[in-house]
A protein has these predicted regions:
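Intramembrane catalytic core of multi-pass membrane enzymes that act on lipidic substrates
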Residues: 1-99
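Membrane-lumen/periplasm interface segments of specific transmembrane helices
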Residues: 65-67, 71, 196, 206-224
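Hydrophobic transmembrane alpha-helices
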Residues: 80, 84, 110-114, 118, ...
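Transmembrane-helix motifs of polytopic, lipid-linked glycan transferases
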Residues: 82, 93-120, 128, 151, ...
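Alpha-helical transmembrane segments of multi-pass membrane proteins
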Residues: 104-107, 131, 148-159, 169, ...
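Transmembrane and membrane-interface helices of multi-pass
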Residues: 124-137
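Membrane-interface alpha helices of multi-pass inner-membrane proteins
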Residues: 137-140, 156-160, 166-190
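Short acidic/glycine- and proline-prone juxtamembrane loop motifs at membrane-interface regions
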Residues: 141-147
Length: 224
């Protein structure tokens, strides 16, 4: 738990974005290099000294990352902000908060994944192929990649969809997109769950509503 990732430097950008957010700065508007060069001058942020460990974070993320705008969706940014709120001055503290979030998501995957497998009459023990996978432990939990958080919302959405609670399932799918954009590719695959007995017309309209709820959720999360 209390260890700095050594196979990825992305976490420096996560912490940077979070500390920008709690300073009232939109992480999508300025690159770290622009702020380092003094592009932004406000009463709230007149120098990099206003952001704790700013020089360490910029150096740690590397010049390639520091020269680009943030591309992390808003729910991801919310996680970064939480890390900044609970560990305003400590890089290791922020890492621990982010890791707790990811571990919590993995436990959620274990819970809803097991329930979903049981509903599908598949061996519930198969969920441990994910939960105990060394790659998952190293890359997600160890190196703080948020695909696990995204997958938690996807699995939860699939579980609710199997229970015919498609509105809440659509909302959760929208939230998953606001963690990582990858679930957008899955949208066409939801048709089989929304078209009972292959009834195209009924399935089409339900799928259309499902997509609209998902899109509305995405827009809502991006609005702030």
């Amino acid at each position: 738990m209390p260890s700095i990732p050594n196979l990825s430097q992305d976490f420096y950008r996560f912490i940077w974005d979070g500390r920008l957010l709690i300073s009232g700065i939109n992480p999508y508007v300025f690159t770290p290099e622009q702020l380092a060069n003094g592009l932004l001058k406000t009463t709230e942020l007149t120098s990099l000294e206003a952001i704790s460990n700013a020089k360490i974070l910029i150096q740690g993320m590397g010049s390639l990352n520091a020269s680009h705008y943030s591309n992390y969706p808003p729910i991801n940014q919310l996680c970064f902000a939480l890390a900044a709120l609970f560990a305003k001055t400590s890089v290791l503290g922020s890492v621990i908060v982010l890791r707790i979030i990811i571990i919590g998501a993995d436990l959620g995957i274990l819970y809803f994944g097991k329930k979903l497998l049981e509903r599908l009459n598949l061996p519930a023990k198969n969920i441990f192929w994910y939960f105990l996978n060394p790659f998952i432990i190293i890359e997600l939990t160890g190196n703080l990649h948020f695909e696990g958080v995204m997958l938690f919302f996807v699995i939860w959405s699939l579980y609710l969809l199997d229970k015919k609670r498609w509105v809440l399932a659509a909302i959760l799918l929208g939230v998953s997109v606001s963690v990582k954009l990858l679930p957008l590719l899955f949208l066409p695959l939801f048709y089989k769950y929304l078209a009972p007995d292959g009834l195209f017309k009924k399935g089409f309209w339900k799928m259309k509503k499902f997509y609209w709820v998902t899109l509305a959720t995405i827009v809502f999360t991006f609005a702030p």
